[in-house]
Each structure stands twice: as C-alpha cells, then as structure tokens.
Amino acid sequence: MYDTLPPELWVQIVDYSGEISLLLTNTSFFELFNLINIKTDIIEYVMENDLIDILKYLSLLKKLGHPIIVDKNILNIKTLNKYLIKNCGENQLEIVKFLVSLGADIRAGNDYAVGLSSQNGHLEVVKYLVNQGSDIRAENDYAVRWASGNGHLEVVKYLVSQGANIRADNDHAIGLASYYGYLEVVKYLVSQGADIRSDNDYAVRMASRNGHIEVVEYLVSQGANIRSDNDYAVRLASQNGHLEVVKYLVSQGADIKSDNDYAVRLASQNGHLEVVEYLVTQGTNIRVNNNYAVEWASKNGNLEVVKYLISQGADIIADNNFAVRWASRNGHLEVVKYLVSLGADIKSDNDYAVRWASGNGHLEVVKYLVSQGSDIRVENDYAVRWASRNGHFDVIKYLVSQGADIRSDNDYAVKWASENGHLEVVKFLVSLGADIKAEDDYAVRWASEKGHLEVVEYLVSQGAVLS
C-alpha cells in the first residue's frame, strides 16, 4: 500500500497527522522530508523514540553514499553531537559508533564526551573515543580528575597510560578521590606521584570531613598533616559526627580546642552526642563563646545533647536566654519544656519566645509558653500580627481566644495577611472586626500589587476600594 500512494498524498497525511514516523516506513519516504511542513529533527525523533534500527539504517545509507543522506539536509550536527555525548555518558557504545558514523563530532563541547564517559566509568567507551582522537587532556584533565573523584580505578589507570596528568588543577584528582573515600584510587594516584600535601593538605582534610577513616589513616601514613588549616580535619570531622575519625585524629595529635573549641560547638549544633561526649572527655570547653554549644543545640532541637551539656555545666540562661528563645522560635517543644524545667526565662527579651513561635506557626509551643505565663500582647500584639502576616491560621485563632487584639498597629494583621495572600486569615480577621479600609485601603492595594486575586475580590466584596 505504501508504495502505491502518490507522494502528494503522503505529504498531506504526514502534515495532517503530525506523525513523522510515517516517513520511516520505506526508504522512498525520506524523499518527502523536505516537502512536509513538520519541522522535526529526524535524529532527535529517532533517538527520543529509541528507533535504533532506523539509526543503523541511516548509518548504512550514509556509508553507501545514498543521496537521501548526502543531498538532503536531514542530519543536524548539533543533534548528533548532543546524543553522542548523552550516550557516551550512558555507556551505549553501539549507539555512539552509529552516531559517529553519521558525522557526530567526538570532540564537541571541548571533548565533553570522553570527559563524561570517564566520569561515569565507562572504560570501553573511553577507549573507543581515545582511538577516534578524543583529547583526554581537555579541560585541564577533566577526564582523569573526575574518573578519580567517582572511584573508577580502571578508567584512571587507562587514562594515565594514555598520558593524562594526575596532578592537574593542583592535584585535584587525589583531592576528589580522598573527598569521596576511594582508597584504592588514592593509593594508585600516590604511586603515580600525586602530592597528598597540595592545597594545604586538602586530601586529608576532606577525607576527615566526610568520615573516610581508611583514607585518612592511609594519607597520614604517607605524611599528610592533620593539623593543617587550624586543625580543620578534627573540627569538620566533629561537625559532621564522624566519631572514629575524631578519635583517630586526636590520637595523632589534633587539637580539639582550636578555633575557640569549634569541634564541640559544631558537634553540639549538629546533634552528634557521642562526639560531644568524647570531646568532653578530652578536655574541650563546652562554655566557650558565651555557651554557644548549648545555645545552638537548643536552637536546632538536639534535646539529648542539650541535656548532656547541662549535666556538664552549660549555662542555659546565657546570652539573655538564647537557648529557650531560639528553641521556641524554631518549634522544638521538648527542648523548650526541658529548659523551662531548669529555670529558663521564657519572658526574656520582651517575650521573644512566644512572639517568634507565633510568627513561625509553632502552635504547641505557643500554647505551652502561654501556659507558663508568656504575654501574647507584648510589642503591640506582635504575636498575632506576625502570625497573620505569615498565614498561621491555627495560631491566630488560639491567640485571639487568649485575648490578642487583631486591630493593633493600625490593623497590621489584616493588612499583611492581605498583602501575602492569606485569604482564610483575612476572612477570619474581617469576621472579628478588622478594618480592611485602614491606612487608605492598604489591604486591597497591596493584595492587588502582589497579584492575590481572590483576596482582592473578597476585600472588594466587603467594601474595599481599589483605586
């Protein structure tokens, strides 16, 4: 049937259906490609629809010098290059070869194909590209650097055999291999002359930071300085909770008190209790920097760390009760309760705790603070105003039930709820008597300015004037 239909009819069929695959059913249909109105990239279509047999067929036609390929403009070099790179990254060697046969440039994008296939560990693709003339040294030896960073030892070895420079970019290869914990790659690079001390001992610092104990031990055995950059290694190992690395570094002479006891402060901040306990046994000072450790453990909700630090003498009321104020602000109810049980002042800094708990929508914290005597009316009803501004409906309703004045500060609550598009809050406030016309119809003007159509429509229905 295909061969009996005239070309004019096929052009109409393809234009009407939008289905370019009809052109791929018979070689003669390629002749119609320049006649149809559909602007479809044939290679894009073939690749996106996994029509590999068509790709092979196109390759054969190209090899035979068929005029369909030679004379017709159906092969887009940018598209060929795009899918060459994509398939190199996906280890599709057969497809890569067909794309190259159709004219794809293996060196497109500054030899990105060999860089990506190296980065992803596709050794056979890498070898093929190198045999076809790819430059493995492109982009400051990107290929070997990221093959190292991703732990592809065999690719690294092959690239080195082909002349790759493992020391490019300030020994980036061993830095990356250490950062990601690829011990065998690290050992191989060292055997090939990589400098583990480059960039202020980047390798051991990053291996420590990321908890790669075996890499750390190996680098130390090769002469790495664990105290570089103000004892960065032990500080960041502590910050990230890598206890075994911390212990090892301490055994090698790391100073846990460097940078104002950074190690215990950040371990506390991030909730790494075992690291904190160990550092305390080694003599760290948990009260440095105005009791930073307990303050930030509280701020981040790390209750067990908070309890331990207090047991070791941390001062919970330091810095104007920072601990309970920020635990409240961030919604950490159990921490708040514990601190209050030990004497923290929830009313410090003009009732900061309840104001910010309200503004951030932490209803259970707000309820608890009110039960403990917090004043929700301070700072001109800051609590309900900011709960309204941020759309925390449940908090608003609770505060109103406790006597908050929604009209404080020239009807701030409804103005800002409107400006920020909180329709249900606006409706609730209006039902309680909020004046939507306050400050020259501020509410509707700013709701309109910010594009909150439903709020605008509601306010207008309630008598607001949109000038």
Swiss-Prot record:
<feature type="repeat" description="ANK 8">
    <location>
        <begin position="260"/>
        <end position="288"/>
    </location>
</feature>
<feature type="repeat" description="ANK 2">
    <location>
        <begin position="79"/>
        <end position="108"/>
    </location>
</feature>
<keyword id="KW-0040">ANK repeat</keyword>
<feature type="repeat" description="ANK 3">
    <location>
        <begin position="109"/>
        <end position="138"/>
    </location>
</feature>
<feature type="repeat" description="ANK 1">
    <location>
        <begin position="38"/>
        <end position="70"/>
    </location>
</feature>
<feature type="repeat" description="ANK 4">
    <location>
        <begin position="140"/>
        <end position="168"/>
    </location>
</feature>
<keyword id="KW-0677">Repeat</keyword>
<feature type="repeat" description="ANK 7">
    <location>
        <begin position="229"/>
        <end position="258"/>
    </location>
</feature>
<feature type="repeat" description="ANK 14">
    <location>
        <begin position="440"/>
        <end position="467"/>
    </location>
</feature>
<feature type="repeat" description="ANK 12">
    <location>
        <begin position="379"/>
        <end position="408"/>
    </location>
</feature>
<dbReference type="InterPro" id="IPR002110">
    <property type="entry name" value="Ankyrin_rpt"/>
</dbReference>
<dbReference type="Pfam" id="PF00023">
    <property type="entry name" value="Ank"/>
</dbReference>
<feature type="repeat" description="ANK 9">
    <location>
        <begin position="289"/>
        <end position="318"/>
    </location>
</feature>
<feature type="repeat" description="ANK 10">
    <location>
        <begin position="320"/>
        <end position="348"/>
    </location>
</feature>
<protein>
    <recommendedName>
        <fullName>Putative ankyrin repeat protein R911</fullName>
    </recommendedName>
</protein>
<feature type="repeat" description="ANK 13">
    <location>
        <begin position="410"/>
        <end position="438"/>
    </location>
</feature>
<feature type="repeat" description="ANK 11">
    <location>
        <begin position="350"/>
        <end position="378"/>
    </location>
</feature>
<feature type="repeat" description="ANK 5">
    <location>
        <begin position="170"/>
        <end position="198"/>
    </location>
</feature>
<feature type="repeat" description="ANK 6">
    <location>
        <begin position="199"/>
        <end position="228"/>
    </location>
</feature>
<dbReference type="Pfam" id="PF12796">
    <property type="entry name" value="Ank_2"/>
</dbReference>
<dbReference type="InterPro" id="IPR036770">
    <property type="entry name" value="Ankyrin_rpt-contain_sf"/>
</dbReference>
